[in-house]
Amino acid sequence: GGMVRNVRAENLSAALINEILERHPEVNPDEVEDVIWGCVNQTKEQGFNIARFISLMTPLPHRCAAQTVNRLCASSMTAIHSAAMAIMSGQGEVFFCGGVEHMGHVPMDHGVDPNPSSSLFSAKASGMMGLTAEMVAIQHRVSREDQDSFAFRSHQRASKSTTSGRFSREIVGVEGHDQEGHLQFCLEDEVIRHDAKLDEIAALKPVFNPVSGPVTAGTSSA
């Protein structure tokens, strides 16, 4: 597991809201109209309107509303859209928007029972992003070499931006545990490979189509 394997989804999100309020004392918690949080697999610790449980762990008043929205990968974006529409229609002025998905605690397919006949009405591999990437690579002729080079450049850019502090205003540190179980304060994305090497990425085996697929762990997002 990763750094936050022992931290629940609600705690992760509550820490974010608490830090934002701490960084921006000009924001009055009493003026927050709604907490709108995106989440796809709304079960276990992410169930029963996780946005409400997150809100209760912050200085926001109990009268502040909270809702959890689901539009799969666009859930957090939909949360922002919903808040924007509410502001434009005069239903409030201050909102907290975000999203959470703790796949270490709630796996992507946990409790999911897709209808087999739905494949008759949807695109091939539309239910799995890994195979979708494989199909896109075939349709648009994106070679393995191009993908590896793109991934390598992404790690280089992420490393440079992180070490130079470009993301410091966008990241809220949280307590977690390293691989040895020691308590540690996490201040950066732990999947960035600061020492990434193109030849090592090129040597990785495909994970979604093991026969001839070009997509590997090195070219997949975390």
Task: Describe every region a protein language model picked out.
Residues V7, P29, C39-E93, A123-E134, ...:
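Conserved catalytic cysteine-centered active-site region
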Residues R5-N6, E10-A15, E26, D146-A222:
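N-terminal extracellular/periplasmic Venus flytrap/periplasmic-binding protein-like
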Residues V69-V100, A137-F167:
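Active-site-proximal alpha-helical scaffold in enzymes
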Residues G1-M3:
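Generic N-terminal amphipathic, Lys/Arg-enriched alpha-helix
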Residues A9-H24, I50-I54, A79, M129-V136, ...:
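Short, well-ordered amphipathic alpha-helical segments that serve as non-catalytic structural scaffolds
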Residues C39, G99, D178:
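Residues that line or immediately flank small-molecule/substrate-binding pockets and catalytic motifs
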Residues M88-H140:
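Flexible glycine-/small-residue-enriched beta->alpha junction loops
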